[in-house]
Design a protein with these regions (language model features):
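Anion-binding and metal-coordination hotspots
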Residues: 1-247
Length: 247
């Protein structure tokens, strides 16, 4: 095959995209089992070096902070990180709305009906949670502590009543020792919103906490240098910008 053969095949691949994906999934079982009881979903986008919108190539929030029109892609992977299905949608569309059409295809065309949906907070809207509270599906998604009601936020940040995952022993995470460095701690409680009865799970990892502490220390050091050198930016576009530590 030569390059022009690949180009000629693109239109066929595009028109048969859904069928090809479902058949690849079904035939993959001939090579081994798929960990399809846990599905991860995320979105990204791709920019085009053009100066005007064209079709689904629309101006939107580029992951690479480019000022060009973009196409967005939603991707499901299985529990082992192997791609399952994807969809493309306009660059100016809210990515929250991309889940339902693709998940519907998985349910109808793939025959994959029993799974746990996992995503970050950006794709964990109330509607997406409701969608995955139906049938044989469930969900585990990230929840911003800052956006919790005051009572739940206070409970989440309270350092008492955690349990050690390895033995369920109740601990106060302010009294951890060096031996607990590799341990994981959690606590949970009922969490009810307008549409759903859920459970809110808070986890704490001493190892990850130390990692985040080191990152903050480095960012504070950079912020101090910015102040000293007079290079402090007035606008803070990135939540990880060191300048956020300076009032």
């Amino acid at each position: 095959y030569e390059l022009h053969d690949v180009y000629r095949a693109l239109s066929v691949l595009a028109s048969e995209m859904d069928f090809i994906q479902s058949e690849v999934y079904k035939n993959s079982f001939f090579l081994g089992n798929r960990n399809d009881r846990i599905l991860y979903y995320d979105c990204t986008n791709y920019y085009f070096e053009i100066e005007q919108e064209d079709g689904d190539k629309r101006y939107g929030k580029s992951k690479e902070h480019r000022p060009n029109p973009i196409i967005q892609m939603g991707l499901f992977t299985d529990g082992d990180g192997i791609p399952l299905a994807f969809s493309l949608f306009p660059g100016n569309q809210n990515e929250q709305k991309s889940l339902k059409p693709l998940e519907t295809k998985i349910l109808q065309q793939f025959g994959c009906e029993k799974f746990i949906y996992c995503s970050d907070a950006g794709l964990a809207s109330e509607d997406n949670r409701v969608l995955n509270h139906m049938g044989q599906r469930a969900f585990i998604v990230t929840q911003s502590i800052k956006k919790l009601p005051a009572e739940d936020r206070a409970w989440a940040l309270n350092k008492t009543d955690f349990k050690r995952l390895s033995d369920d022993k109740v601990v106060d995470i302010t009294n951890l020792t060096e031996n607990d460095k590799e341990q994981l701690f959690y606590k949970d409680e009922p969490f009810t919103t307008k549409k759903l009865h859920q459970r809110l799970i808070i986890t704490y990892s001493p190892k990850y906490a130390a990692y985040q502490k080191a990152i903050r220390a480095e960012q504070i050091s950079r912020a101090e240098k910015m102040v000293a050198n007079g290079t402090l930016k007035k606008q803070r576009k990135n939540p990880n910008d060191p300048a956020r530590f300076v009032n």
